[in-house]
Amino acid sequence: MAEETQHNKLAAAKKKLKEYWQKNSPRVPAGANRNRKTNGSIPEKATSGGCQPPRDSATGFHREGPTSSATLKDLESPCQERAVVLDSRSVEISQLKNTIKSLKQQKKQVEHQLEEEKKANNKKQKAKRVLEVQIQTLNIQKEELNTDLYHMKRSLRYFEEKSKDLAVRLQHSLQRKGELESVLSNVMATQKKKANQLSSRSKARTEWKLEQSMREEALLKVQLTQFKESFQQVQLERDEYSEHLKGERARWQQRMRKMSQEICTLKKEKQQDMRRVEKLERSLSKLKNQMAEPLPPEPPAVPSEVELQHLRKELERVAGELQAQVKNNQRISLLNQRQEERIREQEERLRKQEERIQEQHKSLQQLAKPQSVFKEPNNENKNALQLEQQVKELQEKLGEEHLEAASQQNQQLTAQLSLMALPGEGHGGEHLDSEGEEAPRPMPSVPEDPESREAMSSFMDHLEEKADLSELVKKKELCFIHHWRERCHQKTHHLLSEPGGRAKDAALGGGHHQAGAQGGDEGEAAGAAADGIAAYSNYNNGHRKFLAAAHNSADEPGPGAPAPQELGAADKHGHLCEVSLTSSAQGEAREDPLLDKPTAQPIVQDHQEHPGLGSNCCVPFLCWAWLPRRRR
């Protein structure tokens, strides 16, 4: 459409231009046309000749000579015509320029209008497309609304049917409700009658329970006071026990320092003995070389044969001593191997004991809960007894293991001290060569071989491991006792807060008492205290028997005193296993004449000055038999 309108406008503009040119085209006179037709190409020359100045014409006239007037007039007339034509043409040219300018302006206006029309057409087309899209979307929405309407109508019909069914059910439920209300009213009436009948009985029971709870509360107050007093006593005994332990540890540390100094001196003496042995070996090698050399032709003298016999005896004696030292070293290596095996067995036992202690710890945590305390008292009492028995068994096993380890270590110490003290048994010097120079007698000593070094290092490592294990057992038992105390405190708290509950005994070393339903008499608290004292006396007697057995084992020739690091692990909160070193040291002094060595004597003197901790029996009073006995 727009192109057609443009073509039409262009055709109309062309027509207007033609009409304008026809109107404004100049009308040429007839004389000029004639001159053009007749002269052809001459008019330009004529115009140019006509434009010449009059001087030229005059000169030409004078040159040509005299002419007639007619010819002059004929010449002037075309010149005038040509001037008029030129003027008319200049005017036409200016008019044409003006028309061109106006046409250009019209053309620009027409182009501007065409562009505006194009933009308007584009906008209309875009709007048309948008409207078409909107019409399509509206049609789709219309279809969707129709489908929704259809579904809504169907759902309305369904809900109407359902509402009718619900109304019918409501009527039935209301009828059922009325029936149930009538039944409920009858039941409530019967219950009220029964409650009135039972209220009289319950009042009597509550009064009797209140009286019983008051009695139990008074008994519990008395028991609380006793428990506080016993707790203060236990704290005082614990402080004394800790101070005593600190003093004993300081003593053992001093002993260990002395032992380390003595070991250093023994090492120095050992080095000196090694040097002597080297000298003796050199002298022996020289003697062997001399014996291997051929005898001189001169007859030997009598004193040389005596010296040779003496040297042979010396060689035999030195060889025997060396063989004995080799046997001793082999025996020490075997003892070290056995000791390592026993240490491994002890580590396995300790690991098993740690697992048992962890299981006991878990069971204690479970038993510490208040619900389990009051819901299952019989099971808890059984578990407590089992735990106490297990703890006692563990302590007995630990005591036996410590005694065995102490005896073994004492044997090893005595053997090593005897081996180190052997260099002091010299019997004077004798002549080694024919010149009569005196030399020290060969003294046997422990050779500085790798087996002896390994034995010493393994021995020290064993002591350190035993100290670590004893500390670990201490920590485990402290945790066990701490949880046991927490459990006892929780029981007392629950018994005080709930006077109608059932009470149980919470004793670490005492007997087992169950709480009954009936109240006890006034002398029950005294009986509980008597039970605690009896348990303590039994415990003390058992401890004395254990110490006596330890002393008897120390009097035997084989076992000895425990190492200082291990004695710290023997005091297991009431089971203080301490063995004196006096009897073993005295027995060794009687049997071994090798203790004349100056480095071995201070060890025995130190053990004699400090006879151990067996005489001071300090046992904490931890038998908490403070709860009342209830007889069935």
Swiss-Prot record:
Residue stretches of biased makeup (Gly residues): 508-520
Swiss-Prot/TrEMBL keywords: Coiled coil
Region (Disordered): 1-76, 352-377, 423-452, 496-524
A GO BP entry: Golgi organization
Highest rank taxon of the organism: Eukaryota
Entry keyword Hydrolase: no
InterPro entries the record matches: GM130_C, GOLGA_cons_dom, Golgin_A
Annotated Basic and acidic residues bias: 352-362, 427-440
Coiled coil regions in record: 86-154, 220-421
GO cellular component, one term: Golgi cisterna membrane
Family named by the database record: Belongs to the GOLGA8 family.
PANTHER family to which the protein is assigned, alphabetical: GOLGIN SUBFAMILY A MEMBER 8H-RELATED (PTHR10881:SF62), GOLGIN SUBFAMILY A MEMBER-RELATED (PTHR10881)
Protein name: Golgin subfamily A member 8J
Organism from which the protein derives: Homo sapiens
